[in-house]
Amino acid sequence: MRISVKAPAKINLTLDVLAKRPDGYHEVEMVMTTVDLADRVDMTLREDGEITLDCSASFVPDDIRNHAYKAATLMKAKFQVRQGVHLYIDKQIPVAAGLAGGSSDAAATLRGLNQLWNLGLTRDELAKIGAEIGSDVPFCVYGGTALATGRGEQIAHLGAPAPCWVILAKPPIGVSTPDVYGNLRVAQIDNHPDTKQMLQAIATQDFSLMCQSLGNVLENVTLSLHPQVRQIKDLMIASGADGVLMSGSGPTVFALVQKEAKVHRIYNALRGFVKDVFVVRMLGAQEGEILA
């Protein structure tokens, strides 16, 4: 038996860090939404009980360092499943990009194995398991648009934002999320986003207010470490983007654009500067369907 599950990328419309927690994590407040750039995770039942993984990108780890592998190992142990699984990840989301590709692969694996192994778990139960793998995994289990709080595992679902084009551009570097958080001085943050205003913008589908409300406290840290990120931001703004922000810990930057004519201009300007440029749409509602 074989199942395929889409694993969409996410972008942060806001990312705020409120405090460093005693457990070493940070208390965050983030508005996130999934976009239609997606990996695909194929899962094939193994009767020998083994868990194996292959990926279309050769540099992606195929062991416990991989979030999807970790998800399968956790599910098998937690529910004492006799069978195993072979995972194949068709990688379309750039790695170490601030787009939660690894977390989304893990979430897709949880959803797929729930069906493949006939576990009968709810999305809420899967999200709780996902929190043991990584802070972005619970959001990725649900998809759509949501406010994430706590260390990212507490999810409040939101309606769809105003429809628009999203242009993603990733410079040819990887960014370590622990390194970015390690360089963040919470007491010195002076660019906290207005999360309430963003929630209002989404509730009213106000595109202009959504662009005004974009904010990410990790952006200045990554910009100081990687000047290429600022160059991409500046190029997007100069080319007429309505709103521009770095996603997650970076280095991917996204532009929000309402008029299609602008999309081509911004895309062409970026393609002369970086290789990884994607034009996508927000998925809006909860996503992550099982394909087959």
Swiss-Prot record:
<dbReference type="InterPro" id="IPR004424">
    <property type="entry name" value="IspE"/>
</dbReference>
<keyword id="KW-0067">ATP-binding</keyword>
<dbReference type="InterPro" id="IPR020568">
    <property type="entry name" value="Ribosomal_Su5_D2-typ_SF"/>
</dbReference>
<keyword id="KW-0547">Nucleotide-binding</keyword>
<feature type="binding site">
    <location>
        <begin position="94"/>
        <end position="104"/>
    </location>
    <ligand>
        <name>ATP</name>
    </ligand>
</feature>
<protein>
    <recommendedName>
        <fullName>4-diphosphocytidyl-2-C-methyl-D-erythritol kinase</fullName>
        <ecNumber>2.7.1.148</ecNumber>
    </recommendedName>
</protein>
<dbReference type="Pfam" id="PF08544">
    <property type="entry name" value="GHMP_kinases_C"/>
</dbReference>
<dbReference type="InterPro" id="IPR006204">
    <property type="entry name" value="GHMP_kinase_N_dom"/>
</dbReference>
<keyword id="KW-0808">Transferase</keyword>
<feature type="active site">
    <location>
        <position position="10"/>
    </location>
</feature>
<dbReference type="GO" id="GO:0019288">
    <property type="term" value="P:isopentenyl diphosphate biosynthetic process, methylerythritol 4-phosphate pathway"/>
</dbReference>
<keyword id="KW-0414">Isoprene biosynthesis</keyword>
<dbReference type="InterPro" id="IPR013750">
    <property type="entry name" value="GHMP_kinase_C_dom"/>
</dbReference>
<dbReference type="InterPro" id="IPR036554">
    <property type="entry name" value="GHMP_kinase_C_sf"/>
</dbReference>
<dbReference type="GO" id="GO:0016114">
    <property type="term" value="P:terpenoid biosynthetic process"/>
</dbReference>
<dbReference type="GO" id="GO:0050515">
    <property type="term" value="F:4-(cytidine 5'-diphospho)-2-C-methyl-D-erythritol kinase activity"/>
</dbReference>
<comment type="similarity">
    <text>Belongs to the GHMP kinase family. IspE subfamily.</text>
</comment>
<comment type="pathway">
    <text>Isoprenoid biosynthesis; isopentenyl diphosphate biosynthesis via DXP pathway; isopentenyl diphosphate from 1-deoxy-D-xylulose 5-phosphate: step 3/6.</text>
</comment>
<dbReference type="GO" id="GO:0005524">
    <property type="term" value="F:ATP binding"/>
</dbReference>
<keyword id="KW-0418">Kinase</keyword>
<dbReference type="InterPro" id="IPR014721">
    <property type="entry name" value="Ribsml_uS5_D2-typ_fold_subgr"/>
</dbReference>
<comment type="function">
    <text>Catalyzes the phosphorylation of the position 2 hydroxy group of 4-diphosphocytidyl-2C-methyl-D-erythritol.</text>
</comment>
<dbReference type="Pfam" id="PF00288">
    <property type="entry name" value="GHMP_kinases_N"/>
</dbReference>
<feature type="active site">
    <location>
        <position position="136"/>
    </location>
</feature>
